[in-house]
Amino acid sequence: MGKFVVLDHPLIQHKLTIIRRKDTGSNEFRRIVGEIGGLMTYEITRDLPLEDVEIETPMGKTVQKEIAGKKLTIVPILRAGMGMLNGVLEMVPSAKIAVIGMYRDEETLKPHEYFFKAPKDIAERECLVVDPMLATGGSANDAIAALKKRGVKDIKLAVLVAAPEGIKAVQEENPDVDIYAASEDDKLLDNGYIFPGLGDAGDRLFGTK
């Protein structure tokens, strides 16, 4: 079973409180979502493999460490996942980007994939799927399925807030995927939103409500 980890660093928790507030505007919401994404990336990438590399400093040659193998691929789920992307890239600027477009049917709450674009060698890369909210788990599971269909074997999921129902759904369908969250929230409401949650993260990020 993949692990579920709440990243309870004080800075993450402080910033999460700010974006939970209903009166936080889009500009501040967008900035802080990116900041939390970066802070979470620092913790999530602790186990990236390193290799020795010979370099030359102003003082002479030396052997130092750098990330081994293919670079990490960040996979934001459109559209809300884009809010976390820049923060992650600030921590791992060499990362590649794959984009998955998903939309949720307002009546059935089921997700549908409408777009997928990724590096050609994505099957050889570790992928970090990012989306601010893990609600029913449908979008996350569909995104993970889209990656696995293309041969990806090493997948992690990073979200800001997670409902117990979404955590369970991902762990049952994808027991090989580790989930990282800034918070495990109380529950999923009948309308498909997380409580206490963030509201509609996509609308708040892009000012479309």
Curated annotation (Swiss-Prot):
Pathway: Pyrimidine metabolism; UMP biosynthesis via salvage pathway; UMP from uracil: step 1/1. Its cofactor is Mg(2+). Gene3D superfamilies: 3.40.50.2020. It holds the Pfam family UPRTase. SUPFAM superfamilies: PRTase-like (SSF53271). Allosterically activated by GTP. Uracil binds at I194, G199, D200, A201. 5-phospho-alpha-D-ribose 1-diphosphate binds at R79, R104, D131, P132, M133, L134, A135, T136, G137, G138, S139, D200. It catalyses: UMP + diphosphate = 5-phospho-alpha-D-ribose 1-diphosphate + uracil. Keywords: Allosteric enzyme, Glycosyltransferase, GTP-binding, Magnesium, Nucleotide-binding, Transferase. The keyword Heme does not apply. One of its GO terms (biological process) is UMP salvage. GO terms for molecular function: GTP binding; magnesium ion binding; uracil phosphoribosyltransferase activity. InterPro entries: PRibTrfase_dom, PRTase-like, Upp_B, UPRTase/APRTase, Ura_phspho_trans. Binds 1 Mg(2+) ion per subunit. The magnesium is bound as Mg-PRPP. Its EC number is 2.4.2.9. The keyword GTP-binding applies. Belongs to the UPRTase family. Catalyzes the conversion of uracil and 5-phospho-alpha-D-ribose 1-diphosphate (PRPP) to UMP and diphosphate. This is Uracil phosphoribosyltransferase.
